[in-house]
Amino acid sequence: MRVCVFTEPHRGATYDDQLRMARLAEDGGFEGFLRADHYRSMELEGGLPGPTDAWVTLAGLARETSRIRLGTLVSSATFRLPGPLAMIVAQVDQMSGGRVEFGIGTGWYEREHIAYGIPFPPVGERFDRLEEQLAIITGLWATPPGGRFSHHGKNYRLSDAPALPRPAQRPWPPIIIGGRGPKRTPRLAARYADEFNLPFRNVPETAEAFERVVEAQERIGRPRDGRAPLVLSAGIVVAIGRTDAEARRRAAPLHVPSALPPEDPVIGSPSQLVDRIGEFAAIGATRVHLRLLDFADLDHLDLIAAEVLPQLDSGRDAARTYG
């Protein structure tokens, strides 16, 4: 089982907060450090010192870490135009020496769009735009050196784009698509993604989502077409401790009113987290993203590294392999 740290800096974290956690995760043997891409907290109050831009942050982390994989889980397609986004991700991939993972979704949190004047179309149009963005971004990355890329679609038009810079990873950085949508999300994941992620749901719901995406990839002939099957991953909200009191203290942020849908956290001991990871492994997950709630509580990360990672089959520093 491959284990990544997932964080939500929009709840209130500086770049330095994120750097400390990313470096500690790297030293602790976690495979990846991924972060949300939001501009406003889901909680009704708080969030100081405010949001940080995901890709600006990842560019900095790319130069200040050396082994850990870095990415978004996930970027909102409403925030950036596809041409510039392809350039941004490719450049950060170069800056990291080929350690970037590109998570992207439709965007869902209307409140942050209203706050910053970002258009927020109806959900059907957001899916249309996401699909077109995926076609454009992968098309740009697949263009041979010296070639040009054009696209004339319903929402975006590109003409003779130089398709530069090129990402360090070939054919491109791993693409992560996730979410609870039962129809278009599995189809898009099967067509474009290397990894499908269902965030922070219970095991039965996650199993149902995995079944839908596996069926979707089988319908398009994957992996018979030579592409690797999708990596299936789960997200787990984590608040564990050496004592029940310590675990409950770490779970306190979960009681703050939030716009997030209901989640299924692990609140308890390291062995309970190991058991939950095992349950996800039993339904096909080969990667988990552990959401930590407090950037200042680095002892929480140390505890997971010391008492959870050694109990997992793959051990530490497993190499990531995609088709």
Q: What would you call each of these model-derived segments?
A:
Residues M1-G323:
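Active-site-adjacent structural elements that line small-molecule/cofactor binding pockets in enzymes
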